[in-house]
Swiss-Prot record:
Family: Belongs to the LpxB family.
One GO cellular component, as annotated: membrane
Name the UniProt record assigns to this protein: Lipid-A-disaccharide synthase
Family annotation (InterPro entries): Glyco_trans_19
Lineage, broadest ranks: Bacteria, Pseudomonadati, Pseudomonadota, Gammaproteobacteria, Enterobacterales
PANTHER family: LIPID-A-DISACCHARIDE SYNTHASE, LIPID-A-DISACCHARIDE SYNTHASE, MITOCHONDRIAL-RELATED
Major enzyme class: transferase
Enzyme Commission code(s) on record: 2.4.1.182
Alphabetical list of HAMAP family matching this protein: LpxB (MF_00392)
Keywords linked to the UniProt accession: Glycosyltransferase, Lipid A biosynthesis, Lipid biosynthesis, Lipid metabolism, Transferase
GO biological process annotation, one example: lipid A biosynthetic process
């Protein structure tokens, strides 16, 4: 920071989740340093907080190998241009928000020019391709991690890392209002309720929906009043799910929801879901769950050799034990899924114990992440 100019922070966000994090960070920094300047690659939320966008975030938001290859020349041009322009600007700190394939190389380029760099949101290096930790260590002055076990991993390799808590844990109440969520969804307060979340990607919905629906049919035999809610992330996934349901369980009555995943979790006595961020959100919603996941045999074979963790779901990784049942590949079949869900729908000891542990884990990662991230940026800027 120099006296001639305000605190200058450069940021690059590559997708909507990064734009939300970036906006929260900018807001927290502006409260401390009102005249700070923010520049870089920003989405609408970051721009609304006052970030100058040298490039729109959509330029980086490409998914899949084919799409990335098609845009590779443009992506490389943007990264080279940012390296040059940030090098000339000499910001007090550069913050790369997620988008590791783009940002970590950029961070390394800038660090070589004497610019302090932060990588915000750890890639899953603790789970697979662990050698990436060495590249991250060379490229960044600090990693900001959402989860405590991520910091423990970086500590092993002497890479500076700060656990800041999870923004989702900050955003969700410790004690959600189940009846209020049921009122929103039109679910009777006294009914048993199951949420089915077969994933956000097309391949997941294709692989999991049939077994999830058959599981719900089995559970209806025990709980005839069972209300089934199925939140789907967009119209495409909804069409896909409806097609599969018409083939597998045409007579099964369900509530199809456009989005509203969080409301569905809060309203439900139990959830059956694919792994991923949904499992963390379900934990924070205090909804007992079973994780069911299947992928193509070769992909699973490869994953077993690459993935270094004992569990796949974040609640189990946070707890350090099998807190929630994980049924993968051939284990992910209706009889076993239903058997794991039955004690949760009973609302007895099993689900109460799970609920209490979920609450403890929520408190552990509820640390006001925006404020913690802002503090880390300012300390590095000194």
């Amino acid at each position: 920071m120099t006296e001639q100019r305000p605190l200058t922070i450069a940021l690059v966000a590559g997708e909507t989740s990064g734009d939300i994090l970036g906006a929260g960070l900018i807001r927290a920094l502006k409260e401390r340093v009102p005249n700070a300047r923010f520049v870089g690659v920003a989405g609408p939320r970051m721009q609304a907080e006052g970030c100058e966008a040298w490039y729109e975030m959509e330029e980086l938001a490409v998914m899949g190998i084919v799409e990335v290859l098609g845009r590779l020349r443009r992506l490389l041009h943007i990264r080279a241009d940012l390296t040059k322009r940030f090098g000339e600007l000499k910001p007090d700190v550069f913050v790369g928000i997620d988008a590791p394939d783009f940002n970590i190389t950029l961070e390394g380029n800038l660090k070589k020019q004497g610019i302090k760099t932060i990588h915000y949101v750890s890639p899953s290096v603790w789970a697979w391709r662990q050698k990436r930790v060495f590249k991250i260590g060379r490229a960044t002055d600090l990693v900001l991690a959402f989860l405590p076990f991520e910091k423990a991993f970086y500590d092993k390799y002497n890479v500076p890392c700060r656990f800041i808590g999870h923004t989702m844990a900050d955003a969700m109440p410790l004690d959600p209002d189940k009846n209020a969520a049921r009122d929103v969804l039109g679910i009777p307060h006294d009914a048993h309720c199951l949420a089915l979340l077969p994933g956000s990607r097309g391949a997941e919905v294709e692989m999991l929906s049939a077994d999830f629906l058959k599981t719900a049919q089995l559970l209806r035999q025990t709980y005839p009043d069972l209300e089934i809610v199925v939140p789907l992330v967009n119209a495409k996934r909804r069409e896909q799910f409806e097609r599969i349901k018409a083939e597998v369980a045409p007579d099964l009555s369900v509530h199809l929801l456009d989005g509203m995943g969080r409301e569905a979790m809060v309203a439900s006595d139990a959830a059956l879901l694919a792994s991923g961020t949904a499992a963390l959100e379900c934990m924070l919603a205090k909804c007992p769950m079973v994780v069911g996941y299947r992928m193509k045999p070769f992909t699973f074979w490869l994953a077993k050799r690459l993935v270094k963790t004992e569990y796949v779901s974040l609640p189990n990784l946070l707890a350090g034990r099998e807190l929630v049942k994980e049924l993968l590949q051939e284990e992910c079949e209706p009889q076993k899924l239903a058997a794991a869900l039955l004690p949760l729908l009973a609302n007895g000891k099993t689900s109460h114990a799970m609920h209490d542990t979920f609450r403890e884990l929520h408190q552990q990662i509820r640390c006001n992440a925006d404020e913690q991230a802002a503090q880390a940026v300012l300390e590095l800027a000194q």
